[in-house]
């Protein structure tokens, strides 16, 4: 009872503003009794659960946890290095079900929101957990930019710079949560199958992101003779040189975490690695760098279920399957096709809830710098409801892939093995978006699209080499 009394004593001393977010302990844990919370009779207007990756942003994650726990009930603030979000949310929603006849708990369940602070991988992790719970009224999610790229927060108006961790900064963020609007976002499932590797062939020590776990043998999508991995992403899947640079960055950060405690230093290191990995000067430093067409056969499926081969120009060394208008720290690779292009190629603006994913190609980092110019964009390859990549035998020993900021080194077939990656639409979740939101919904009358004047799509580059 000591914890309950302490938490309610804190509630009594809170400002009216902070009381709008406070959740009584008995709602969060079955170990606490409601009688001890009797003074908290008014349901909070914006009850929140806060999930923070304490290792994100150098020391910022740990500092942010302390501030939130000082301002709110410490039981509603969770360190993702200590407890996983699936266990936390399952426990809380089971308790809310137990308290379904409690009017205060019911109101909190109906109004509940989530704040997640971390990199894009951390945010995607929370989104996936909420999606997997299949809740009748899933809580909308606000994202605190605590990583290096921060594409997810930027796409929904939360900024891309690491936040302050002091009381004033946190209260300012909470104020934005109150005024944020809900917006649906498409969820994309990724399924990867690898034929059982032979001794010494396809790498057995494969290290994949935690968001792409191996499925159980009893799963209906499991196939005998194959290792099958399934996960999801919300922003992008990429293949090629951009993922290779990201992999080098993550590898160095794991080896020397003390060197990566500042966002500006991280971005500078990333740029240096882009040069040394050959992303700028492939012909000079990495003449054997693989173009995508040599690595994989790619097929796309439209809304009508029609599969077609996707033509990839020989000069393309990186492709991105993109859901949000934010990549590599806020750039928009797809842009907005002009009306003529939309008619000629059946392209649309990049809505985040239309069940279509945009596929963009890049030749090199110089090509990527075009995104910094007005109306700049990558090579628009296609929009699709599903994408299938089949990797060719002997094309290369491995390829680099990345989902929502989490890269890995993928072994490729050498003999009769196969590697297949399939991306498909898999429902939606609710995000919280500020007035600075860059993402557009196909259902919003306010989604006015400004068309670019580009007449060329950067897709006529097959014979162009840097």
Swiss-Prot record:
EC number(s) recorded for this UniProt protein: 2.7.1.107
Cell membrane is among the record's keywords: no
Cellular component terms per the entry's GO annotation: chloroplast
Class of this enzyme: transferase
Chemical reaction(s) catalysed: a 1,2-diacyl-sn-glycerol + ATP = a 1,2-diacyl-sn-glycero-3-phosphate + ADP + H(+)
Keyword match Cell membrane: no
Keywords for the protein's UniProt record, in alphabetical order: ATP-binding, Kinase, Nucleotide-binding, Plant defense, Stress response, Transferase
Domain DAGKc stretches: 43-194
GO biological process: defense response; phospholipase C-activating G protein-coupled receptor signaling pathway
GO molecular function: ATP binding; ATP-dependent diacylglycerol kinase activity
Annotated function: Phosphorylates the second messenger diacylglycerol (DAG) to generate phosphatidic acid (PA), another important signaling molecule. PA is required for plant development and responses to abiotic stress and pathogen attack. May be involved in the accumulation of PA during cold stress.
Subunit structure: Monomer.
Family membership: Belongs to the eukaryotic diacylglycerol kinase family.
Listed name of the protein: Diacylglycerol kinase 6
Organism phylogeny: Eukaryota, Viridiplantae, Streptophyta, Embryophyta, Tracheophyta
